[in-house]
Swiss-Prot record:
Cystine crosslinks: none
Listed GO biological process terms: translation
InterPro entries from the UniProt entry: Ribosomal_uS2, Ribosomal_uS2_bac/mit/plastid, Ribosomal_uS2_CS, Ribosomal_uS2_flav_dom_sf
Entry similarity comment: Belongs to the universal ribosomal protein uS2 family.
GO cellular component, one term: cytosolic small ribosomal subunit
GO molecular function, one term: structural constituent of ribosome
Keyword Ribosomal protein: yes
The organism of origin for this protein: Mycobacteroides abscessus (strain ATCC 19977 / DSM 44196 / CCUG 20993 / CIP 104536 / JCM 13569 / NCTC 13031 / TMC 1543 / L948)
Superkingdom, natural source: Bacteria
Protein name: Small ribosomal subunit protein uS2
Keywords: Ribonucleoprotein, Ribosomal protein
Region (Disordered): 255-277
A Pfam family the protein falls into: Ribosomal_S2
Length: 277
């Protein structure tokens, strides 16, 4: 069974790229056409690349690896936290702090400080201190929690990272590349595919698209964890969105018809506009 369907991708708006004046020419091979000044991403390729990324993530986790989720733009923050938490993986959905990967030993010391402050608060360690001292310690704890809470249990650099919007997360991408950590990423039409090991061509600005593709990666992790523990079971499938427009229904029908002749459905195209972050 497919990891994700053409209809789910269409429902989420994954096919909408950026305006044609805002693009990276290196993404040309992933573009199907353009409509009303908006590039339309080739979802047939998206399905193929999703399968490749899914298999890589599943095998990485099955063999004991971990995947860090990175997405600090507003549209990605909630799904990044929810899906990473669902499968027990580290995540960054606030500001990326320089050195999170390349200087992890220092970051790990800050994590120890966070746990120390939390322990003090829970075991009465704040008692006997002045109100000013308690306020300063609480502020320090809250600041560390906000910036490092998603990686609080990370003991070493991850085996791979999953990124929503490689342009916005260029610092994370640069650090991962410096350490030769594989990068899985949603690639919109304004991104550079050369910096990514496992690209997933798609809309990284729409909330539903980012959520769907993040959920797919988390499901690959869940399956990898099951394989690691010797358990059998299927992955959780992403949910479909709102009803398709008539032209999208025709596109879907065309893709379904093509399935009998090829291994993957064909992608076609669109009107409307994209949500841009």
């Amino acid at each position: 069974m497919a990891v994700v369907t053409m209809k789910q991708l269409l429902d989420s708006g994954a096919h909408f790229g950026h305006q044609t004046r805002r693009w990276n020419p290196k993404m040309k091979r992933f573009i199907f056409t353009d409509r009303n000044g908006i590039y339309i991403i080739d979802l047939q390729q998206t399905l193929t690349y999703i399968d490749k990324a899914y298999e890589f993530v599943k095998e990485t986790v099955a063999h004991g690896g971990s995947v860090m989720f990175v997405g600090t733009k507003k549209q990605a923050q909630e799904p990044i936290a929810e899906e990473a938490t669902r499968v027990g993986m580290p995540y960054v959905n606030q500001r990326w702090l320089g050195g999170m990967l390349t200087n992890f030993s220092t970051v790990h010391k800050r994590l120890q400080r966070l746990k120390e402050l939390e322990s003090m608060e829970q075991t009465g360690g704040f008692e006997g201190r002045t109100k000013k001292e308690i306020l300063m310690l609480t502020r320090e704890k809250n600041k560390l929690e906000r910036s490092l809470g998603g990686i609080r249990d990370m003991q070493k650099v991850p085996s791979a990272i999953f990124v929503v919007d490689t342009n916005k997360e260029h610092l994370a991408v640069a650090e991962a590349r410096k350490l030769n950590i594989p990068i899985i990423a949603i690639l919109d039409t304004n991104c550079d595919p050369d910096v990514v090991d496992y690209p997933i061509p798609g809309n990284d600005d729409a909330i539903r698209s980012a959520a769907l593709l993040t959920k797919v990666v988390a499901s690959a992790i869940a399956e990898g964890l099951q394989a690691r523990s010797g358990l059998a079971g299927g992955d959780e499938k992403p949910e479909a969105g709102e009803p398709l427009a008539e032209w999208e229904q025709e596109l879907l029908a065309s893709a379904v018809a093509t399935t009998d002749e090829a291994s993957a459905p064909s992608a076609a195209a669109t009107e409307t506009t994209t949500e841009e972050g």
